[in-house]
């Protein structure tokens, strides 16, 4: 890590701590996730690194490299100076339909690319979408800790993700198509941008987790009268929030929907995306062999010394619902509750 100068803490969570660093040679800023060496370097960490490494797209946080320190495995990635889309919604209350579409187009562009690379994210939510620092913000999908690749891994069966965003079929604990479940989560993100609340929470009892699950399973949602939403937008949401995953709208169908196509920036078109991907193929990246060797070495316990002064963030990541014995015992503050009440 000699080439990087630590600037400040930018977050913490179940994984460890994240810091903003500066490349002393280029002055470029990066975000680094530090994970303690030893037992914490498990299959989930390896999966996150391998899936993230394979993805190169303008709407996905760019993976740079993994580095080993005496105490930690460091994952170096692009730094998004604009913060979370979640924070932007908290500050705004809700977005206009045009602003929601602007970010939704970018979200779908990134998710479509992930799926084309045979990677399903499985934890799409506002907190896992960052913004760069530009005046016209570019959305960046991050956090591939729960992602699965159909090339590297079996079809998902575990119930992972943030409760408010989980698709009905994921709650069934049977094998499901992670790509189709991602579509549902994108719909929840769109709804929250438009309304400023989660679609399946009871407005009179938003912290009742059991009730939220029941409403998800029965696809019980509505758009409040005070929110003006076009007929095309309502139609798209009604095609996303379909309990039967086989009947749910697909990503290619979303990309052809009239609401999605309205004011679509040229950089969101398939032709432009393909040209960008061809250019990215020539971008050098850390070799697979080097990455795997570093991960294997990181499984060995490091020195007892710990990084000092971990920062704090409001959202500490998602939970795995398979680890929950009684949903009444859940701390709703950290389970996807929309903490910015309107």
Swiss-Prot record:
Pfam families: Pkinase
Gene Ontology BP terms: abscisic acid-activated signaling pathway
Keywords: Abscisic acid signaling pathway, ATP-binding, Kinase, Nucleotide-binding, Phosphoprotein, Serine/threonine-protein kinase, Stress response, Transferase
Stated regulation of activity: Activated by phosphorylation in response to hyperosmotic stress within 5 minutes.
Tissues showing expression: Expressed in leaf blades, leaf sheaths and roots. Expressed in shoots and roots of young seedlings.
Reactions that this protein is recorded to catalyse: L-seryl-[protein] + ATP = O-phospho-L-seryl-[protein] + ADP + H(+); L-threonyl-[protein] + ATP = O-phospho-L-threonyl-[protein] + ADP + H(+)
Coiled-coil region list: none
Superkingdom of the organism of origin: Eukaryota
SUPFAM superfamilies: Protein kinase-like (PK-like)
One MF annotation (Gene Ontology) recorded for this entry: protein serine/threonine kinase activity
InterPro entries linked to this entry: Kinase-like_dom_sf, Prot_kinase_dom, Protein_kinase_ATP_BS, Ser/Thr_kinase_AS
Stated induction or repression of this protein's expression: By hyperosmotic stress in leaf blades, leaf sheaths and roots. Induced at lower level by abscisic acid (ABA).
Residues where ATP binds: 10-18, 33
PTM notes: Phosphorylated.
Active site: 123
Class of this enzyme: transferase
The enzyme's E.C. designation: 2.7.11.1
Outcome (variant: residue 162 to D): Loss of kinase activity, and activation by hyperosmotic stress
Gene3D superfamilies: Phosphorylase Kinase, domain 1 (3.30.200.20), Transferase(Phosphotransferase) domain 1 (1.10.510.10)
Domain Protein kinase: 4-260
Region: C-terminal, residue numbers: 253-342
Domain remark from Swiss-Prot or TrEMBL: The C-terminal region is necessary for the kinase activation in response to hyperosmotic stress.
Functional summary from the UniProt entry: May play a role in signal transduction of hyperosmotic response.
Protein name in UniProt: Serine/threonine-protein kinase SAPK1
Organism the protein comes from: Oryza sativa subsp. japonica (Rice)
């Amino acid at each position: 890590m000699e080439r990087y100068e630590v600037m400040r803490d930018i977050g913490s969570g179940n994984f460890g701590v994240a810091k903003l660093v500066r490349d002393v040679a280029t002055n470029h800023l990066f975000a680094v996730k530090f994970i303690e060496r030893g037992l914490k370097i498990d299959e989930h960490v390896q999966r996150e690194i391998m899936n993230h490494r394979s993805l190169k797209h303008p709407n996905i946080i760019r993976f740079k490299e993994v580095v080993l320190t005496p105490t930690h495995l460091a994952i170096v990635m692009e730094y998004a100076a604009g913060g979370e889309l979640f924070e932007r919604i908290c500050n705004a209350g809700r977005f206009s339909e045009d602003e929601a579409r602007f970010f939704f187009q970018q979200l779908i562009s990134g998710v479509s690319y992930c799926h084309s690379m045979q990677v399903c994210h499985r934890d799409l939510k506002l907190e896992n979408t960052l913004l760069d620092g530009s005046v016209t913000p570019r959305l960046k999908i991050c956090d591939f800790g729960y992602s699965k690749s159909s090339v590297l891994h079996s079809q998902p069966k575990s119930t992972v993700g943030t409760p408010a965003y989980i698709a009905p079929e994921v709650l069934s604990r049977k094998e499901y198509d992670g790509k189709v479940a991602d579509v549902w989560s994108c719909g929840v993100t769109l709804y929250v941008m438009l309304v400023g609340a989660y679609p399946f929470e009871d407005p009179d009892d938003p912290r009742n987790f059991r009730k939220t699950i029941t409403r998800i399973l029965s696809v019980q949602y509505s758009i409040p009268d005070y929110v003006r939403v076009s007929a095309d937008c309502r139609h798209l949401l009604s095609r996303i929030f379909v309990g039967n995953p086989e009947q749910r709208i697909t990503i290619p169908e979303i990309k052809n929907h009239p609401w999605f196509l309205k004011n679509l920036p040229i950089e969101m078109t398939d032709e432009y995306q393909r040209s960008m991907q061809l250019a990215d193929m020539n971008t050098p990246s850390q070799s697979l062999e080097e990455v795997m060797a570093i991960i294997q070495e990181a499984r060995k316990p490091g020195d007892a010394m710990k990084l000092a002064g971990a920062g704090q963030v409001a959202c500490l990541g998602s939970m795995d619902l398979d680890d929950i014995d009684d949903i009444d015992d859940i701390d709703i503050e950290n389970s996807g509750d929309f903490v910015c009440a309107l």
